[in-house]
């Protein structure tokens, strides 16, 4: 239907069109100077030292795990309440994902759950900054340091998120996403930030065939013809067309996130009169990027199941999302780990629903969602 309200829509405008035209007019549309500008901009945003642009956050996770040497016999700790790409990359490298539970109300992985899962085979910890809020990084990094285990932050939801006064990605290694529904987007893309120069060099090589130089060489104005393959790598570089869009979006980040926050505040106010339960906010100091606004639909409390609510909203022309169905309940992982039970993850996986939230959402759009929720709740 023409008036269908999606749960997300990218906020594009004249700036993005102009950025694309500039790249097209330049004659260099693949990885080039716009990538370097984007990487420098993300270093400024996060306060970290190095950044490597990639074709997706999944690609970034893949090469980050590879750069750590993750492989057969290794274990990687991650919440099950995450998108399956992280699990898939761990498995495809021959390692074992060790899925842990999350806090029932924030959906954040906790240091207690992580520590209980650590074994001599643990080679990485991947906390997820969920829905735009940060995980408890001080406690998680303290665990990593105590046990000598690297931490890779899944910051796909966290562009604009801060933890105790510092932007996510200010230290260590973090991976951001520019997918179409994210706070800033270039359709598909991602970036890895890190404070380790050797690690950054490995990422840069692995993302471009394993060559010893990046896809763009600053001195020659293109890839050095004498570049050699140092180790087998992938084709995960980001075209400048995408990088230019991401740069234009990044300049709008504060305004885009401010609008998201305003809509989230309206949702919170409206939920006081509805039976649906929003996620709780973390207790530590933070700035929320409001990538998602998630409610829990408990049939005993709401008189309707989550799936029935989503179906009813769809008949009213309103889209919703599910972020996420727990990874360990997916067919492959359910069959591989048949005895795994994560009670708080499973409770939420059956009840969570993402409501429409995007910067161009109007007051009329918002009113439409709230009216529909009241109708469904029988109010």
Curated annotation (Swiss-Prot):
Q: Which keywords are on file for this protein? A: Aminotransferase, Antibiotic resistance, Lipid A biosynthesis, Lipid biosynthesis, Lipid metabolism, Lipopolysaccharide biosynthesis, Pyridoxal phosphate, Transferase
- Necessary cofactors: pyridoxal 5'-phosphate
Indicate the enzyme's highest-level EC class: transferase
Q: In which pathway does it act?
A: Nucleotide-sugar biosynthesis; UDP-4-deoxy-4-formamido-beta-L-arabinose biosynthesis; UDP-4-deoxy-4-formamido-beta-L-arabinose from UDP-alpha-D-glucuronate: step 2/3; Bacterial outer membrane biogenesis; lipopolysaccharide biosynthesis
Gene Ontology MF: a single term: pyridoxal phosphate binding
Sorted alphabetically, the Gene Ontology BP terms of this entry are: lipid A biosynthetic process; lipopolysaccharide biosynthetic process; response to antibiotic
> Which Pfam families does the UniProt record give?
DegT_DnrJ_EryC1 (PF01041)
- List the EC numbers from the record: 2.6.1.87
**GO terms for cellular component:** membrane
Q: Which domain of life is it from?
A: Bacteria
Reaction(s) this enzyme catalyzes, per UniProt = UDP-4-amino-4-deoxy-beta-L-arabinose + 2-oxoglutarate = UDP-beta-L-threo-pentopyranos-4-ulose + L-glutamate
Q: Which residues carry this modification: N6-(pyridoxal phosphate)lysine?
A: 182
Q: How does it assemble?
A: Homodimer.
Function, as annotated, reads:
Catalyzes the conversion of UDP-4-keto-arabinose (UDP-Ara4O) to UDP-4-amino-4-deoxy-L-arabinose (UDP-L-Ara4N). The modified arabinose is attached to lipid A and is required for resistance to polymyxin and cationic antimicrobial peptides.
Family, as annotated:
Belongs to the DegT/DnrJ/EryC1 family. ArnB subfamily.
Which PANTHER family does the annotation name?
A: TRANSAMINASE, UDP-4-AMINO-4-DEOXY-L-ARABINOSE--OXOGLUTARATE AMINOTRANSFERASE
Name of the featured protein = UDP-4-amino-4-deoxy-L-arabinose--oxoglutarate aminotransferase
């Amino acid at each position: 239907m023409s008036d269908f309200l999606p749960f997300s829509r990218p906020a594009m405008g004249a700036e993005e069109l102009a950025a694309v035209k500039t790249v097209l007019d330049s004659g260099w549309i693949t990885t080039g100077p716009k990538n370097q500008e984007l990487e420098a901009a993300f270093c400024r945003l996060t306060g970290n030292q190095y950044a490597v642009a990639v074709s997706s956050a999944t690609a970034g996770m893949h090469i980050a795990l590879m750069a750590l040497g993750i492989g057969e016999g290794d274990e990687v700790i991650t919440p099950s309440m995450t998108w399956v790409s992280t699990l898939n990359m761990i498995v495809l490298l021959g390692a074992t994902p060790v899925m842990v539970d999350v806090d029932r109300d924030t959906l954040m992985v906790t240091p207690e759950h992580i520590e209980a899962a650590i074994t001599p085979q643990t080679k990485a910890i991947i906390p997820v900054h969920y829905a735009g809020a940060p995980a408890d990084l001080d406690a998680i990094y303290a665990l990593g340091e105590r046990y000598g285990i690297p931490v890779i932050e899944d910051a796909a939801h966290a562009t604009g998120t801060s933890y105790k006064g510092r932007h996510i990605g200010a230290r260590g290694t973090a991976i951001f996403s520019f997918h179409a529904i994210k706070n800033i987007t270039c359709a598909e893309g991602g970036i890895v930030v890190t404070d380790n120069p050797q690690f950054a060099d490995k990422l840069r090589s692995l993302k471009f065939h394993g060559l010893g130089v990046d896809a763009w060489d600053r001195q020659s104005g293109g890839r050095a013809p004498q570049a050699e393959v140092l180790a087998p790598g992938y084709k995960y570089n980001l075209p400048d067309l995408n990088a230019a869009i991401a740069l234009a979006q990044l300049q709008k980040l504060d305004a885009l996130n401010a609008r998201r926050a305003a809509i989230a505040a309206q949702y919170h106010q409206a939920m006081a009169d509805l039976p649906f339960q929003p996620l709780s906010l973390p207790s530590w100091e933070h700035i929320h990027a409001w990538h998602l606004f998630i409610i829990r639909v408990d049939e005993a409390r709401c008189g309707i199941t989550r799936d029935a609510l989503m179906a009813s909203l769809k008949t009213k022309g309103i889209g919703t999302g599910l972020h996420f169905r727990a990874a360990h309940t997916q067919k492959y992982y359910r069959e591989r780990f048949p005895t795994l039970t994560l009670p708080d993850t499973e409770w939420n996986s059956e009840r969570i629903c993402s409501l429409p939230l995007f910067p161009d959402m109007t007051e009329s759009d918002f009113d439409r969602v709230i009216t529909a929720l009241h109708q469904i709740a029988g109010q």
